[in-house]
Amino acid sequence: MESVRLLVLVLALLWSPGASGLRFIGDLRMDLSAVIRRVDRSFLSVTVDASLAAEEKFMSLLSSAKVRTLAKALSPSFLRFGGTRQDFMEFSPQRSHQDSGSTEDESCDQLELPSWLENQLKKAWTKQQLTLMREDLHRKYRRVKFTEDTVDLLNSFSVCSGMDLIFGLNALLRTDDNIWNSSNAGSLLQYCESRRYRMSWELGNEPNSYEKKAGVRVDGLQLGRDFSRLREMMSQSEFYRGAGLFGPDVGQPRDRRVDLLEGFLKTGSEAVDAITWHHYYVNGRDTSLEDFLDPEVLDSLALKTKEVLEKVRLVSPEKPVWLGETSSAYGGGAVGLSDTFAAGFMWLDKLGLAAKLGLDVVMRQVFIGSGSYHLVDENLDPLPDYWLSVLYKRLVGPEVLKVEFSSVAQRKRVRLYLHCANRKSYQSGAVTLISMNLSQKPVWISVPARVSSSTVEAFVLQSDRPEEEGLYSRCVTLNGVVLKMVDDRTLPDLKGTRLPPDEHLQLPAFSLAFFVLTDAGAPACK
């Protein structure tokens, strides 16, 4: 097997007494001859939380020119509309299907939100979030009715942003026999078909928690039968016969959740196109900065993923497995952490590790919605994880390559992943080294002579403030320049810094980076 062993001298600056200054830490081995995994083209995807529709007027924020500009940069992507409140929502049509509504033929510019209304909604959303937080805290959720307007706005947003919509249906509408009552979903499918809205579907959100949230217990076997019923409904529709269906969106493995997943796989695996589960590292109400930088916390994803994959492979070996909802901390995120630069270490490591382990899609909770783990804040401004996501989209291809780091001492805090570069941005044969330095000391990676002729483009993300203080910042720099929108319709140029041949690749303290070896000539990437 043709293999390229890239000796990468990792030099760390040591401050301990008697240290000579620089020390050889270990070497990096890259196999550029073979692809070990290939993820979906929409691997990095996003969600819009159903909380946005708790009061339907807030759905109009999806018509903001600024929000749509930000969303377009994340295409191609799945756009999942769902979350806790999807199981407390009912479709309540208010007009005949012949009435005017948005269509794919309309200009996206015609559907934009006026600036005065956008400002009004942003102010009101601040108050709305407090109401939503109280509901989450007490697990008391209002029953919400949504109209065609919500569906129209979601369709328009997904079409104009170049995203593929996945709509989450209410699974808590149940008969006296505890069977899913599909009549409301039938009305929604009928409306969407009349408008020719192309979308996929889900049914229910974290069914493992229904007993706590709604006093209803649904086992996995019944849930699988409910999905089979939905698939039957879709097959009766000429328009949605070939549409996607994903589920069961169960929480990460733990006791009953494993039983629920196993039961679902027995009766529902053939109904779905991918198995979905959710993952969060920590409790947002009981965490710290140390958790966000703890290698053991980051490594916990591997254990959970392997457990889910083992269960799925026993029943449906070829079925794709997705992280259908994920972020740093559950419970709406960790205030003062999930929306800061520090959250980027969890996010980028999750993307790298998930692809390496064999997950096909990772859906980030949340692009816009309640909580503190969003990519776009309450003022509709992009947060650090947004910029990280855009760079990932532009620089990283779907092909995963093998990379090994020999130093046991540093491999936990210097985390590295390797992909073919995105071929829309770079020529074939280019590779992208995804790099993270979780320590407060800088690290240097020395590219060996074997690839010294390759141009290297460096994209180094750091906080706009120094040292540990900067980890709490909501601003990020790319190669020293603060990232912010030029205007509501324009993102800044996200240009890398070209490094001369034989230059050490510097990974500063507390930094995230993409190093693109543009002329690596990797056989696996041709």
Predicted regions and their residues:
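Non-catalytic accessory regions flanking glycosidase/transglycosidase catalytic cores in CAZymes
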Residues: 2-274, 302, 306-324, 328-526
